[in-house]
């Protein structure tokens, strides 16, 4: 445990009046950040669909090439997340957001130019996709670290809830918008539309009036110094009980969920015999769930307390997935049951994410916000490929229904570190900040 404060000390507070918390929407700088991040999130979702379609439709790429392109775009989350955290903690975060937006806009605008001049090849997409992915990692980490500088402590949950709603809307609407753009304007032009959206984000964030203090000089400019800074972030996360519990919970969840997802997508057509249209309905139920969860996430801690909200939302989201293995056969009832499971998983899962993120930001000193966010991002994205392998091998070894059940049990086990930690006992007030060890 770190010296001084364990960030989740339990206090017996009375339920606060939620009306006493000023609306986050009255904060003009937050509104600009929300607008910019929303534009950036939509750009990322449009690009995530359009880049592979450029490979398929414009370059007639093979299935292996498309798979490699997808992996290359995601690879920076594993390779550069920890180092991105160091940079975010040593540079003004608003500047990073603007620079990564402009950088991704420039990178993506190269795609249609190369296509129109008959110079575009799959190798170009690999290179451009990788650097665009690096920009996304930096933007994500900087965005999480920047929010606590713009809003009051009591507004963090509402702010994260609003940003979570944008993430949900982009997840639902971004691919659909990207599909329409590809259909009407071709895939390379759809990529250009993503670049324009990044420009909108950069301009909006540039108008934020909040002035950040000059970052503290650091030894991180040298390779050895950078590694020491990375280690300091890892030590802070795993050396403090509440942050360690969050990270362990996230790693168990992501490992199990990725394995479950691999099995579930095979379970529906092969075991239940669902048609592509029925599978689409089941997966579409996630969208409304995301929006409902994000809409209510900001209010739940004021009504039920932070610890109870975290434990309850995580319990419902994870335990409901045990119901998948009980579904037999196709037909309306099976589809409706799976839609309900996905809806509940999405709504309670988003509410849990918002609450956990708000507490993590509150516990973390400003000088470590980037590295703590990056460590969590590294764990979440880094363990997913292992989960996919486990899901595939289990499905082949013990069958899809058994795999769905086993991985859902694994998902439920993510509740254990949360339930045993001091996080579950946090009442209505956000916990005090953990003091950084010298």
Q: What residues fall within each predicted segment?
A:
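Alpha-helical transmembrane-bundle signature of multi-pass membrane transport and export proteins
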Residues: 1-438
